[in-house]
Each structure stands twice: as C-alpha cells, then as structure tokens.
Amino acid sequence: MTTRVMKLFFRKYGNGPPLVILHGLYGSSDNWVTIAKHLSDSFTVYLPDQRNHGQSPHSKIHDYDSMSDDLYELVNDLKLKKIFLAGHSMGGKTAISFALKWPEMLF
C-alpha cells in the first residue's frame, strides 16, 4: 500500500449489504446519486469521490494503485468486511486494481 493514502469524501444511502460505486474520470459521487437512491432499498450504497475529484483531497499522485489504496482505507475506516463493487471508466479500473489486491474483500 502506498504511504500517501487520501481520506475520501463519500455519500451514503440506504440499508443492506454494502455496495460501493466508483465514478469515472472528471466525475464525482454526484453522478450516481439517482441510481444510489433507487438501489437504497436493497443495499447500503457508498459513493466516494476519488482523489482529485469532487470533495476529496487533491494530489499530484494519480494512479490506480494509489486510488485502490484510498478505497481500501475507506472500506476499512467504515469497518466493512466485504463489499459489492462497481465502477465506471476510471472507476472500473480502480475497482479492478482493488479486486486484484484484495479479492477476499469482495462478494
């Protein structure tokens, strides 16, 4: 894990198994609010702003390894043991990086 982990801003909706949805490049958690509200009857939906996006901190470091480490830190801070994970575009690549590093944390 990198030593420059960012504490990510996130939005939370609903109750149920945890589902994290990651936005794409130049997006933010705002992009997924409508869908999160629809899914909130079945899931607890977490919408983080990835580093350098939305309300999360900014850094010169912007790579998938670092972004997946940021997500790992968020999941641990929230005390989530396992998550469902979805991502669009850049968020999809972050999700793949996370899945390769921590497959045991995914349903």
PLM region spans:
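N-terminal cap/lid segment of alpha/beta-hydrolase-fold proteins
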Residues: 1-7
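Active-site acidic short loop of glycosyltransferases
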Residues: 5, 14-16, 41, 79-82, ...
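Conserved HGGG/HGGXW glycine-rich cap/lid loop of the alpha/beta-hydrolase fold
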Residues: 9-58
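Short, well-ordered alpha-helices that flank and scaffold nucleotide-derived cofactor binding pockets
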Residues: 34-37, 41, 73, 100-104
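Active-site loop/oxyanion-hole signature of alpha/beta-hydrolase fold enzymes
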Residues: 36-37, 46-86
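Conserved hydrolase catalytic core segment
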Residues: 81-107
